[in-house]
Amino acid sequence: MSEPQNGRGALFAGGLAAILASACCLGPLVLIALGFSGAWIGNLTVLEPYRPIFIGAALVALFFAWRRIYRPAQACKPGEVCAIPQVRATYKLIFWIVAALVLVALGFPYVMPFFY
């Protein structure tokens, strides 16, 4: 039998897509903050044309994670993971942490000019 979906994959996909969406702007700033320098840092904007695709993927993945976590729970058999209230509360907490990180990553390119 297959394991029931719990939203973990959608949370991971949303977080990864948000990181990729802000990689063109966040990457050079992180490298400069770590002490790296050079003209090659300007080439890290290669992902900029794909930013809208990554933003869309992040939002779609978060929607599916939200739907999987907050929709009415299916009947769980005793002893299954979905029957444990602490697990559901943990998934909700992780969802909101990832959602906040996605919003920070998506908004970072707009506040980045204030750091340079």
From Swiss-Prot:
> Which Gene3D superfamilies does the protein's record reference?
bacterial mercury transporter, merf
Per the entry, what this protein does is: Involved in mercury resistance. Probably transfers a mercuric ion from the periplasmic Hg(2+)-binding protein MerP to the cytoplasmic mercuric reductase MerA.
GO cellular component entries = plasma membrane
What does the record say about its membrane topology?
Multi-pass membrane protein
User: Where does this polypeptide localize?
Assistant: Cell inner membrane
Q: Does the keyword ATP-binding apply?
A: no
Q: Which residue windows are transmembrane per the record?
A: 16-36, 46-66, 94-114
Cite a single Pfam family from the UniProt record.
Answer: MerT
Predominant cellular place of this UniProt entry's protein: membrane
Q: What is the organism field in this record? A: Alcaligenes sp
Listed InterPro entries = Transprt_MerT (IPR003457)
Family statement drawn from the similarity comment of this UniProt entry: Belongs to the MerT family.
- What cystine pairs are annotated? none
For this UniProt entry, the molecular function terms from Gene Ontology, in alphabetical order, are:
mercury ion transmembrane transporter activity; metal ion binding
This chain's protein is named: Mercuric transport protein MerT
Q: Which domain of life is it from?
A: Bacteria
Q: Which UniProt keywords apply?
A: Cell inner membrane, Cell membrane, Membrane, Mercuric resistance, Mercury, Metal-binding, Plasmid, Transmembrane, Transmembrane helix, Transport
Q: Which residues of this UniProt protein bind Hg(2+)?
A: 24-25, 76, 82
